[in-house]
């Protein structure tokens, strides 16, 4: 994924911190509601814990189907888990597949840490500060 320029004053309806499985779903859901969304992810890719934890033998301890999103019947039909308890690379591959299928990367800033979030009561607005 290409490097993005730093942002200064940008407005979004919602900001999601993290592009793990919860962050990807939240981005998909908020966009489906017609909201403008930005996701900030500290890692260089999506997948959350499955991006960060790449040690030998890493795999899920719940059935792989528990990681499957149910918001798209087409997605459910086209993805088949190879094992009941999938290894880390397969789970990460699934997260990337979902991000690509639903064009989620367009709204995700990778390698970007949120340093602080400040709520301005007078403006009724959050201000998000990142390391970029």
Range-by-range predicted roles:
Residues 81-132:
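Feature captures the FAD/FMN-dependent oxidoreductase FAD-binding
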Residues 30, 52-55, 124:
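Short, glycine/charged-enriched secondary-structure capping and boundary segments
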Residues 24, 46-47:
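Catalytic P-loop NTPase motifs of RecA-like helicase/translocase cores
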Residues 1-12:
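A short, basic/flexible loop-to-alpha-helix module at the beginning of a structural domain
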Residues 29-31, 49, 98, 102:
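Residues within well-ordered alpha helices
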Residues 44, 51-97:
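Glycine-rich active-site loop/strand segments that organize a redox cofactor
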